[in-house]
Amino acid sequence: MQIFKPASGHTHSTVQKSVVNKLNFYYGGYQALKNIDMMVYEKQVTALIGPSGCGKSTFLRCFNRMHDLYPRNHYEGEIILHPDNANILSPEVDPIEVRMRISMVFQKPNPFPKSIFENVAYGLRIRGVKRRSILEERVENALRNAALWEEVKDRLGDLAFNLSGGQQQRLCIARALATDPEILLFDEPTSALDPIATASIEELISDLRNKVTILIVTHNMQQAARVSDYTAYMYMGELIEFGATDTIFIKPKNKQTEDYITGRFG
Amino acid sequence: MPIPNNTDHSPGSLRRSYKRYLKERVIELLLFLAAFLSVFITFAIIYLLISESLVFFEHVSVWDFLTDTQWTPLFDDAHYGILPLVSGTAISSLVALVIALPFGTIIAIYLSEFAPFTVREIAKPFLELLGGIPTVVYGYFALLFVTPLLQTILPDLPGFSLLSAGLVMGIMIIPYVSSMTEDAMRSVPMHLREGSYAIGATRFQTAIKVVMPASLSGIAAAYILGISRAVGETMVVAIAAGMQPNLVWNPMEPAATITTYIVQVSLGDLPHGSVGYQTIFAAGLTLLLLTLVFNILGHLLRKRYREVY
């Protein structure tokens, strides 16, 4: 049994970026999320933890309406996005607009069959940016923010598949950053990577927390403790406990949360 | 507790079983023969075409064959220029591909990226039905329906034309192109599409900018297959394009293709061994080389744009 050292040395913000109100989600007839209430604070890292099948990825994917891509999925409740104070789950909201502002990085690195440059420029190009000078500037910025610029600056024309797994994942982060999203969603971003690449991605997430609001799903509790400011523990589609990461990891209120964090189950 | 005695087996239990070994070898041999047979037949056809063509080229120089602009092997004033047949083949194929490739691709994009499950399940069998119609039916469809229809727009169109044959051939090839293209696009993993959607791309942008480049090798294979079919198609052009070997580049004229010429001579009463009869082997060899070029091209494309996910 081990108590993990929580992330420290950076200020907790209490500015609300997003508020989740009574969120229910259904895959056809199956209810995957039950009555979830949660806060997402601006420029903070919020980790979603819990055993497999608890609904943490499902919850994350609600934030950029990824469930709209498949038939018979159905949301109830609200995810309010500030400063608009609008419910992004409302049928009047265009999921494409939501995804323009809330971007996502996936479990498995998924670069497109294009050059490194075109991968990062993709989000800008689909928004109609054509000026070469603007593209070059934004691509360089995104690659710098993703800590990849130094490694690829001399081979921006190479196919993205030629990069290593960790580099591909940082490229996907650069791709998501290029369009200046307000919230960045990470769905187990290191589960397909080796320990060294994992460390570099975690470091990157720590660096990014001052620039963008981050939500991260992780199986790895040490990772949640290391990178996050807030932690939500989920079980069977419900949010069991939510609070500052220090509190959740050192003195959780709920017995179930404590059991999971200390490795007694899950 | 007694320690189990490991040496207490009947001796020789580890020895190779000859019965099993023999059975495996027989199966291996049968599989090899099946594979060998198809390769053997291919080479036999190539051997036949080349050896018979050599007889033809003893009478006609390769230079004349490739440059003469007339193809009249059955006339008293015989000319043996393959160009008129090649032009007929090229024009009818071109017309067919102008129809089949864009429509096939559009249908594939719709079915793979846009169509709801039920629509796809209903539409695919119908498309495959289109591919199952005998080509002779397409030929008469071209001659008796499409040509008169075209004549209302183009009054100068003759009763036999490459245009009409090519159009119908294009319709005929659409299912081949669309079904192979769709398979290639559907095999692109979902997580690649999600990566595109997740940063705000529309379905169309995702289809054009991510899914199509990712499945390029499969799409290239589909196009090559379409081209090969158009070049090798016989019945539709034989019925609807006329059989006069004309060196034309205008689709609104009647002309013969390589395949229709071979049919014409095979069904005729030319004596075997005459130069006139040998022409069909030279024509067949030309056709084989043409399709070979496309297959090699397809192979190179596949290697160039190999899928890596």
Swiss-Prot record, chain A:
Keywords, comma-separated and alphabetical: ATP-binding, Cell inner membrane, Cell membrane, Membrane, Nucleotide-binding, Phosphate transport, Translocase, Transport
Q: Which molecular function GO terms apply here?
A: ATP binding; ATP hydrolysis activity; ATPase-coupled phosphate ion transmembrane transporter activity
Q: Which reaction does it catalyse?
A: phosphate(out) + ATP + H2O = ADP + 2 phosphate(in) + H(+)
What InterPro entries has UniProt attached to this entry? AAA+_ATPase (IPR003593), ABC_transporter-like_ATP-bd (IPR003439), ABC_transporter-like_CS (IPR017871), P-loop_NTPase (IPR027417), PstB-like (IPR005670)
Annotated residues for binding of ATP: 50-57
Pfam families, alphabetized? ABC_tran (PF00005)
Which of the seven top EC classes does this enzyme belong to? translocase
| A GO BP entry | phosphate ion transmembrane transport
Cellular component, GO annotation: plasma membrane
The keyword Transferase is assigned to this record: no
Subcellular localization, per the record? Cell inner membrane
**UniProt xrefs under PROSITE patterns:** ABC_TRANSPORTER_1, ABC_TRANSPORTER_2, PSTB
Q: How does it sit in the membrane?
A: Peripheral membrane protein
Describe the location of the ABC transporter domain by residue ranges.
15-261
The UniProt entry, under CDD domains, shows: ABC_PstB_phosphate_transporter
EC code: 7.3.2.1
Give the top-rank taxon of the lineage listed in the UniProt record for this protein: Bacteria
* Known role: Part of the ABC transporter complex PstSACB involved in phosphate import. Responsible for energy coupling to the transport system.
Give the family from UniProt. Belongs to the ABC transporter superfamily. Phosphate importer (TC 3.A.1.7) family.
Record's subunit section: The complex is composed of two ATP-binding proteins (PstB), two transmembrane proteins (PstC and PstA) and a solute-binding protein (PstS).
Q: What is this protein called?
A: Phosphate import ATP-binding protein PstB
